[in-house]
Amino acid sequence: MTDSSNEHETENPSLPIPDNEIQDLQQEIATLKAELKEKNDKYLMVLAESENARKRMQKERQEMMQYAVENALIDFLVPIESMEKALGFASQMSDEVKNWALGFNMILQQFKQVFEEKGIVEYSSVGQKFNPFLHEAVETEETTKVPEGTIVEEFSKGYKIGERPIRVAKVKVAKAPAPQEKEEVEK
């Protein structure tokens, strides 16, 4: 009978479990839940860092491409300005030269259109207040005709993309005349 009662005890799942064993199991469950939460948090953090790194690399790649395009186009600014100056003199030439100039002017406009499509625009400086972020003062002129710090002449145009200058304008800036010293004549 003892064998059958032992058999009966192992088959009965409703045997009482000691309290300390329940507490140990509950503690183990709590520990496992905490570890799972910690690992899940780390996983989410690594996933977010990975996504941020991907976005950062994509942005850097776009910026590098943009700067490469800008640098390539900047190299065309001087020849384009030279062509503009040369075309300015064409009106004083023969009709044949004027016809050639008309064709070159069309090409020049195509270059300018490409610049505009890439976001590169020239900005006007004459009459504006000198801004060291947009202008390089290569000369000054004493005058009372305009306020001090006003740009009176532009030697080369400035260009920018959006609000960021890619080449500053070279300008002449007005400055107030120096006060004249009175000569003292002693006799």
Swiss-Prot record:
Residues 1-21 are annotated as: Disordered. Keywords: Chaperone, Cytoplasm, Stress response. Its main location: cytoplasm. Homodimer. Participates actively in the response to hyperosmotic and heat shock by preventing the aggregation of stress-denatured proteins, in association with DnaK and GrpE. It is the nucleotide exchange factor for DnaK and may function as a thermosensor. Unfolded proteins bind initially to DnaJ; upon interaction with the DnaJ-bound protein, DnaK hydrolyzes its bound ATP, resulting in the formation of a stable complex. GrpE releases ADP from DnaK; ATP binding to DnaK triggers the release of the substrate protein, thus completing the reaction cycle. Belongs to the GrpE family. This is Protein GrpE. The gene is grpE.
